[in-house]
């Protein structure tokens, strides 16, 4: 965040502290696989994928037939999304949203680059676009007609629980812990990961967690054109619908990077923007001088606020990651302390009494009172819900605030998912790939995204 100055315009540079808001300005890293690699058989279904907590076993690549049959209708995994020329449905919807956008906020333009370089960007200190990366703005001006971002839990002494960057192939230990404690969370899924690791995505949904969008390729959204912003969100929604059968109505911008232009496109897709109030920096351990002890201290800082009166009127929404084995393990270590310090730990839909979390009206998220009574699963219902159930009815004083699979790998150092991906053992990973529809054998073509720092 850049301090306010008297200047009307501010030139942003990549080296400024501003570039390190939220996720430290880190970039998605890529590596070469050094040649083709063949898969053999491993997990066969969701249940078998959920058994092992050995990272090498969990992250063995597999082919999931429903994904291989539809992969050609999606953007290339881990590349910037765009609308294919033959997707007339997407083109028509984008045209409608874009027309509204250009009418309401024509002067809100892209900032910087998709990797977070703002060198030479001129932006007014008055923050006309409510640009979170500039000043952590979460409440657009009234004339935009945009809703405020969700950034706190409105109920007192309540931890809003969510995990970014999933599904991760090595998440079984974390999900086992959540299951054993009847604990639900909001999972912010990357579209490329959903198609890479569909069985892992299915576990999250089937065990009653809320699923939200975290874009297709995890880039700084305010740097992207209107069409690319739309495609990054739209095709992630579509991937989640294709694999899980539900259409999310919530999203979190990578790095927190959002402004009114991006918000308006998201709202055109019925997506509510969710940010956070507290950052554990779990993603940063081992980089930029950040130690594992620093991450533990960050967790402890949030826990300490529960004891000093900070959360008597509301609670935090905390940034955690399903990114690496470490980010998941440190949460597991701190979970008993979190439970002891806070009265409640809930997913975001529950915190805001959003009982219809998806476009599909027969799926219900328990409201706050129901959840704390012990009924925690997001589940199907035979009773149809109308759109009014998505209204925020939180009671805290903070409420006004804001099918089978085949696979394996000869080499345990390589992991990947159903779309033909490979990456590091504990990675939220993906790659460009293709599958032989006759033999079910995948051939890595390259472009791997390893277990890298995503927010």
Swiss-Prot record:
Top EC class for this record: hydrolase
Any one GO molecular-function label of the UniProt entry: metal ion binding
PTM per Swiss-Prot/TrEMBL: The GPI anchor is required for the attachment to the cell membrane but not for cell surface targeting.
Keyword Signal attributed: yes
Predominant cellular place of this UniProt entry's protein: secreted
EC number(s) per entry: 3.5.1.41
Cofactor section: Co(2+)
Bilayer disposition of the protein: Lipid-anchor; GPI-anchor
Matching PROSITE patterns: NODB (PS51677)
Residues lipid-modified (GPI-anchor amidated serine): 429
Effect of gene knockout: Triple knockout of CDA1, CDA2 and CDA3 results in an absence of cell wall chitosan, melanization of surrounding media, an increase in capsule size, sensitivity to cell wall (sodium dodecyl sulfate), osmotic (NaCl) and heat stress, and avirulence in a mouse intranasal infection model.
Record-listed acetate binding positions: 164, 255
Signal sequence segment: 1-19
One of the record's GO cellular component terms: side of membrane
Spans annotated as Disordered: 381-423
Keyword Phosphoprotein: no
Similarity comment text for this entry: Belongs to the polysaccharide deacetylase family.
This protein's name: Chitin deacetylase 2
